[in-house]
Amino acid sequence: MVRLTVLAGFLLTSAACSACVIGERQAASSINNAFKAKGKKYFGTCGDQGTLSDSTNSAIVKADFGQLTPENSMKWDATEPNRGQFSFGGADYLVNYAASNGKMIRGHTLVWHSQLPGWVQGITDKNTLTSVLKNHITTVMQRYKGKVYAWDVVNEIFNEDGSLRKSVFYNVLGEDFVRIAFETARSVDPQAKLYINDYNLDNANYAKTKGMADHVRKWISQGIPIDGIGSQTHLGSGGSWTVKDALNTLASSGVSEVAITELDIAGASSTDYVNVVNACLSVSKCVGITVWGVSDKYSWRSNDKPLLFDSNFQPKAAYNAIISAL
């Protein structure tokens, strides 16, 4: 009877501690610690209340990653669904979680054509949109002033040919919306790094990559306070991209830093992941990497199995390969 009681107690303790075992295992080989030892600022991931309140997912975040990006909770539809009526429950959760666990924060995102409430999309008056844009940026950034390392001020504003996307912001304000957004952001939090962020910036000779670099170079020459370019780096398998060369092209625009901001790779091969990590290590202005999620279970590309942990939160070969490479 005593032996059965002891066994039952052991099983109960083991079950209750499953998350902490994961945490202890990963803490011994933290990607963030290894990456920072190479001179970089962070190796991070994204999350929000749903994933961060999953104890197994959270244990890995706490042990392995040094930075957090809100996946959805800071986007316009979440923070200002109706004009002048702000909602910060989800964003507050992430910021408080990050502060409690010593994680840097990348704010994402202030100006984006997608996940944009209809009331914003319907604005046609230049003065009205300017006022709305300034108020939104000011209100969101002011709430988290001093707590956010970097902000994606504008997101996905380029077409694949390197021209500017025809969003409500461009249609009403023209290219000037970029200046308005960055100048407002700088005035609210002068210490935060201000980024422009986009996808398909993975080949140096691609029109979108060159268009981004050329526009940013011009905007900086005009005094627009752009500190960094974020390359989302959502990749297919097989390495038909030149991330290192692309990062160098982006860095040549005159920004003080670049970052890989939303990394995931279809199939999550060890070779592909190590190549991307080495690309950032090889570019002096590349300050960090953010993978777009912890586990395939919660990935927006779950069918592609693109992350470093499988659906059961077990580290993949790519995880171990990165640790070995670092």
Swiss-Prot record:
Which residue positions are annotated as catalytic? 156 (proton donor), 262 (nucleophile)
| Alphabetized SUPFAM superfamilies for the sequence | (Trans)glycosidases (SSF51445)
Q: Tell me the domain of life.
A: Eukaryota
Q: What are the GH10 domain coordinates in residue numbering?
A: 46-325
Write the lineage as a comma-separated list: Eukaryota, Fungi, Dikarya, Ascomycota, Pezizomycotina
Q: Which PROSITE patterns match?
A: GH10_2
Q: Gene encoding this polypeptide? A: xlnC
| Family of this protein | Belongs to the glycosyl hydrolase 10 (cellulase F) family.
What factors induce this protein?
Expressed in presence of xylan and repressed by glucose.
Q: Which UniProt keywords apply?
A: Carbohydrate metabolism, Disulfide bond, Glycosidase, Hydrolase, Polysaccharide degradation, Secreted, Signal, Xylan degradation
Extent of the signal sequence: 1-19
The reaction(s) this protein catalyses: Endohydrolysis of (1->4)-beta-D-xylosidic linkages in xylans
EC category = hydrolase
Q: Which Pfam families match?
A: Glyco_hydro_10
Q: What does this protein do?
A: Endo-1,4-beta-xylanase involved in the hydrolysis of xylan, a major structural heterogeneous polysaccharide found in plant biomass representing the second most abundant polysaccharide in the biosphere, after cellulose.
Any single GO molecular-function term of the entry would be: endo-1,4-beta-xylanase activity
Which EC numbers does the record give?
3.2.1.8
Gene Ontology CC: extracellular region
Q: What is this protein called?
A: Probable endo-1,4-beta-xylanase C
